[in-house]
Amino acid sequence: DADITGPSIPKSFGLTERVTCNEDGTVMYPETSKNGIKVMSLNLLMEKETDPVIWRGPVIAGVVKQFWEDVDWDETDCMFVDCPPGTGDVPLTVFQSMPIDGIIIVTSPQDLVSMIVEKAINMAKLMNIPVLGIVENMSYFKCPDCGNIHYIYGKSKIDEVAAANDIKTVAKLPMDAKVAGLVDSGKAEELDVSALDGIFDAIMA
């Protein structure tokens, strides 16, 4: 969880125990979810999860680097790094200090967000990081009563952005109260993830 000032991954997986270290404090051990997913997050190091993190960029970048270098990840087949939005210190540190195979950009339908996505794509290109695909979150709402689709944040523009940059749109995820409920209650692993098949295909291609 590289979103240092707004970590949410532990809560999504119901992880509340603080991480442990070896005897001399040089190695940290990640927490493990019910299904065996290893998680490292600043919230797993803090006394209270609601305490603010008021750090400058270089300190935040240093913590992100520590999460990669000073955590015993053991044998890991695939690692996901959740970055905050934008092109700041965190993604820059991730791109420079980790062996990144590619990134998935997550966006939403608003015009303003599309501009930020373009910045992220251009940053990846400048640093020779492959963009595996784009995901549009909160793309639409499907009425459970009538089945009609409503575009709460306006019609999707993700396909235009993807085509302009020769990138695949790998998923358009609807607004779903059930998803929000499971994540808020720490049960992310109980989600029906069939809507994410396109993302998995892009990663494994």
Segments (PLM) and residue ranges:
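Conserved Switch II/interswitch segment of TRAFAC-class P-loop GTPases
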Residues: 74-81, 87-88, 99-120
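Residue-level signature of catalytic and energy-coupling elements of molecular machines
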Residues: 9, 40, 64, 82, ...
